[in-house]
């Protein structure tokens, strides 16, 4: 059977690294008594559009917890330069077809709506010329806009397809009139968008990605998606269909989630 006639399968992969500079042992830290990675995996199970789901980790303790809970675990190397490189290893281990789609679900977002996972997958399916898809949301306040930890994205409409032009930790786009004025800045520009770290990839891209050296802008910004743009790939992008609740980066984030009602994690 030719590849054009073969069905396209969708795989959800949850990368889970134990090492974190801001919050050590993050995947195994508990929310209402359950390791965070298991909350995330249970959310992934609600995404009924996917053919399968697995957790990718380089740590035996994470693998043990996930396997004992009944989840598929793939052990990966510990020396990957980025999460995308790790997904490429998973795709190779699993032997997924080049035309299949991989959805990267962050392991520190236990409240992510499954709707967003489906949206990013559908976005890639609908743009045959893009090798990757992601989501964004408007930035309303100026402090968020200028913060380096918030990744900004600018995009353009090409042939009725919205595609990313550039991602940056810098405040882009720049409103020239505001920058040159003496007034205090209180809000972000109208076209300011925050990039959400949710991706869908074609396996064929992952196969190429690992053979590309890290690019100058990728290294400068520490943003792996720039490697795709610098190598001429198109990244489809759309405004998220619903809000993405904040994930867990710090102990304060973890405390906030533990203070929430248990039903917030159990609802569809």
From Swiss-Prot:
CDD domains named among the record's database cross-references: CMP-KDO-Synthetase (cd02517)
Pfam families, A to Z: CTP_transf_3
The protein's name: 3-deoxy-manno-octulosonate cytidylyltransferase
One GO term (biological process): lipopolysaccharide biosynthetic process
Gene Ontology cellular component list: cytosol
Enzyme Commission code: 2.7.7.38
Name of the top EC class for this enzyme: transferase
Organism: Psychrobacter arcticus (strain DSM 17307 / VKM B-2377 / 273-4)
Compartment(s) of residence: Cytoplasm
A molecular function GO annotation: 3-deoxy-manno-octulosonate cytidylyltransferase activity
Main location: cytoplasm
Keywords per UniProt: Cytoplasm, Lipopolysaccharide biosynthesis, Nucleotidyltransferase, Transferase
Gene: kdsB
Function statement: Activates KDO (a required 8-carbon sugar) for incorporation into bacterial lipopolysaccharide in Gram-negative bacteria.
PANTHER family: 3-DEOXY-MANNO-OCTULOSONATE CYTIDYLYLTRANSFERASE (PTHR42866), 3-DEOXY-MANNO-OCTULOSONATE CYTIDYLYLTRANSFERASE, MITOCHONDRIAL (PTHR42866:SF2)
Pathway annotation from the record: Nucleotide-sugar biosynthesis; CMP-3-deoxy-D-manno-octulosonate biosynthesis; CMP-3-deoxy-D-manno-octulosonate from 3-deoxy-D-manno-octulosonate and CTP: step 1/1; Bacterial outer membrane biogenesis; lipopolysaccharide biosynthesis
Family: Belongs to the KdsB family.
């Amino acid at each position: 059977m030719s590849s054009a006639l073969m069905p396209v399968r969708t795989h959800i992969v949850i990368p889970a690294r134990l090492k974190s500079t801001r919050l050590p042992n993050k995947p195994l830290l508990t929310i209402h008594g359950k390791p965070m990675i298991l909350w995330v995996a249970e959310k992934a199970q609600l995404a009924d559009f996917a053919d399968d789901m697995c957790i990718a980790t380089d740590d035996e303790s994470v693998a043990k917890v996930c396997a004992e809970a009944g989840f598929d675990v793939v052990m990966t190397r510990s020396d990957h330069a980025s999460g995308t490189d790790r997904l490429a290893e998973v795709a190779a281990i699993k032997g997924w077809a080049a035309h299949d789609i991989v959805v990267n679900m962050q392991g520190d977002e236990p409240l992510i709506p499954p709707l967003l996972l489906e949206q990013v997958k559908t976005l890639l399916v609908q743009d045959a010329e893009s090798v990757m898809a992601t989501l964004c949301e408007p930035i309303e306040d100026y402090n968020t806009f200028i913060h380096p930890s918030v990744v900004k994205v600018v995009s353009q409409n090409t042939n009725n397809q919205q595609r990313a032009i550039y991602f940056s930790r810098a405040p882009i786009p720049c409103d020239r009139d505001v920058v040159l004025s003496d007034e205090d800045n209180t809000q972000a520009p109208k076209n300011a968008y925050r990039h959400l770290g949710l991706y869908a990839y074609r396996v064929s891209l992952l196969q190429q990605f690992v053979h590309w050296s890290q690019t100058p802008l990728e290294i400068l910004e520490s943003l792996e998606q720039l490697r795709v743009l610098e190598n001429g790939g198109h990244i489809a992008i759309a405004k998220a269909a619903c809000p993405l609740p904040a994930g867990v980066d710090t102990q304060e984030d973890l405390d906030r989630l533990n203070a929430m009602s248990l039903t917030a994690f159990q609802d569809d």
